[in-house]
Amino acid sequence: MKSTQRVTELVLCLALLGSLLIACVAAPAAPADTGAAAEPAASEGPRMGGVVTGFVSSDPKSFDPAAIAGWDQGVIAPNLLEGLFRLSPDGREIEPAIAESFEVSEDGKTWTFNLRAGAKFHNGREITADDFKYSFERVLNPETRSPKAWMLSIVVGAQAFQDGSANEVSGIRVVDAGTLEIELAEPLAPFKAMLASINLAVVPQEEVEKWGEDFGQNVVAAGPFSLGEWNLNQDVTLNSFDDYWNGRPYLDAVSFRFIGDENTRIVELDAGRLDMAWVPPAHWERFSTDPVYKEKLGWAETFHTDFIAVNLDREPFGTNAKLRQAVRYALDLDAIIASLQGRANVAQGLLPPGLLGYDEDAVLNYPTNLESAQALMAEAGFADGVPGTFDVILPPWGNLIKLLEIYQANLKEIGINIEIKPTEFGPYMEALESGNYDLAWMYRVTDYADPDGFYFPLMHSDNLGAGGNYARYANADVDENIATARATIDDAERARLYQEVDAQFAEDLPYIPLTHNIYVDVSTPRVQNYVPSPMDTHMFHRVWVEE
């Protein structure tokens, strides 16, 4: 049999993280204290003014919070967008933003937010509770086609609003201009973390209606920077927002150039035309020994997992768990880590270290073992190999293709032939959402710093297909454990439930886990107080430059 994967075009969001996966994997050994490397002593404290130039892999196309789904957008957008909460610069803490304070009812279902007086949009208008109601209902509105509508699906009245039987979401209530109330159908442990997502940022209705389909290219929001000049496929500039509720940023502006090639970024860094870049493996030795740059290396173990998604609706891989287990045993992940110079860790499941529920003593146990792989091939009914060739679709990132060639050679040893199919991001995502694929390389960076950001979209049957469960995995016990964990406030009990999910995952393997990235970047000596984030975001509101 063959697997002739047809992929059509798609959006331009995820392909960018491929660059991240390869350019940002980690070096032989991180310094004892991860996060940003120690800064050289500055002659003075933070100073106002200046411009920092960063990069993303390609033009983000849109900063509409309801539509954001890709890496390039996610790097830049947190500087433009803000909602009730925000992430700290290192991505590990949730900070109050436009919600100055909040209360949760005893039953955990009703959340009341007291908005910060005087917080403004970039157009100068003060933000009110009505703006949040509008923004959240816009995400839920089927006409918006937001890929993150599931984040608010637990709000009372969300389903009625989405199916057209109600003209508003009854569980989102404006108490007064400065007070917002949200009622959930049941308690949701990660709700606060979800509200820090850029997808749930507040936007002004009048600007959305003014710009229509072009709002994403002319976004008006409430973050520390506002959208400035945007040169298609070249660069975008964000300008400091003087009326930001927390005081204007130190910088006058941040510019992001669109540079896909990792070596070009290094050339531009050396020429003084970039202030930061990922450190490719080939350049690690140079930067780690340079007396200036070695003090400007930043590290972060990311909340990022790469894996091979299996379409469970298609034979033979989707209908045969033993065949999927054989695939995992056959993959030489240590060779992958070596090729990345140690800038990644072997993934023992979907969940990366550092998130609630990760248990290194209870993780997936599929070490590279050809004998085990061949035994499982025989049990699966394919002792002589699987007839035919099967496509693996993936974004068209050069270094990623090189990694897939290692997997291709591994699988050939046990009689599985795959063809590597680089696919533009639009068609790639279209294939995942429609189920028009057999195997696909994928990654996930959690939308919020909670295990629910992995398990609910990828494994709950409510999210089959476009909702994020691209494997089309459905297991009633897993659904129940995920749902119970979402509604449980006790962290120990949540961790136990997720470990039960992991145990079932290890048996079923709807996704074949590969690696977790370790992010390594370098900045020029003038950049101060920059911290890389495990969430793959670049936050600049506390960055300053020393000239």
What is each residue range found by the language model?
Residues 521-547:
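Long beta-strand-rich cores associated with HINT superfamily self-processing modules
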Residues 88-89, 166-173, 177-178, 184-249, ...:
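Gly/Pro-rich hinge or "lid" segments in bacterial periplasmic/extracellular proteins
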Residues 213, 241-287, 408, 417-419, ...:
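Ligand-site clamp/hinge motif
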Residues 192-194, 288, 313-355, 402-403, ...:
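Periplasmic-binding protein-like
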Residues 45, 325, 337, 417-428, ...:
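Extracytoplasmic/peripheral linker and loop segments enriched in polar/acidic and small residues
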Residues 345-379, 397-402:
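Structural transition elements
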Residues 55-106, 137, 217-221:
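N-terminal lobe/hinge region of extracytoplasmic solute-binding protein
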Residues 54, 378-447, 491, 516-519:
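Ligand/substrate-recognition segments at binding pockets and active sites
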